[in-house]
Amino acid sequence: MSTNNTQDDAAEEEDDDLQYFVRIGTTDLDGTKAVERSLTDMKGIGKRTARIITDVASVDRHATFGLLEEDEIDSITDAVENLDDHIPGWMTNRREDFFSGDTDHKTGADLEEKRRHDVNRMKMIDSYKGVRHKRGQKVRGQRTKSTGRTEGTIGVNVEAIKEEAAEAAEEEE
């Protein structure tokens, strides 16, 4: 019975130390998941990139994110912010930026902003992809004849027919 109590006490202490949300950059990450898994919730970071980040930060990737010490979280934050220094150029998501020519790895809101800026630039210069974006059509050569139809189907609405028949029957009476 006493071993059960010590296990319960240890579990309660872990719950007290657990941070349910860990903030990295502008993103709140789940503190109840493993470090590697939680990092993949951030835009611009996948499984492979998360593994590299944990290796660079010297943190156990299977550890619960919310139970890490402040210095470990700071090392992960530094690894995310300086990720382009630790990965090869072909692995970054901003290779040879159009304006600056730099190779960089963007994450979170910065990545969304850059993508939106790129799409707007394509629309402004009326490139083929920009025109497709303007029209709301598929951009990467997918078929459009039969797939991707967002409009509702033009079929028979049985309920509407029944309602019209009921209204017509009431009018006749």
Swiss-Prot record:
Query: Could you tell me which InterPro entries the record lists for this protein?
Result: Rbsml_uS13_C, Ribosomal_uS13, Ribosomal_uS13-like_H2TH, Ribosomal_uS13_archaeal, Ribosomal_uS13_CS
Task: Give the signal peptide, or none.
Answer: none
Q: Which Pfam families match?
A: Ribosomal_S13
Note the coiled coil stretches, chain numbering.
none
State any single GO MF term.
rRNA binding
Give GO terms for biological process.
translation
- Disordered, as annotated region: 130-155
The protein's UniProt keywords, in alphabetical order, are: Ribonucleoprotein, Ribosomal protein, RNA-binding, rRNA-binding
GO CC aspect terms:
cytosol; small ribosomal subunit
Stretches with biased composition (Basic residues): 130-143
Q: What does this protein do?
A: Located at the top of the head of the 30S subunit, it contacts several helices of the 16S rRNA. In the 70S ribosome it contacts the 23S rRNA (bridge B1a) and protein L5 of the 50S subunit (bridge B1b), connecting the 2 subunits; these bridges are implicated in subunit movement.
Per its record, how is this protein called by name?
Answer: Small ribosomal subunit protein uS13
- The gene for this chain is rps13
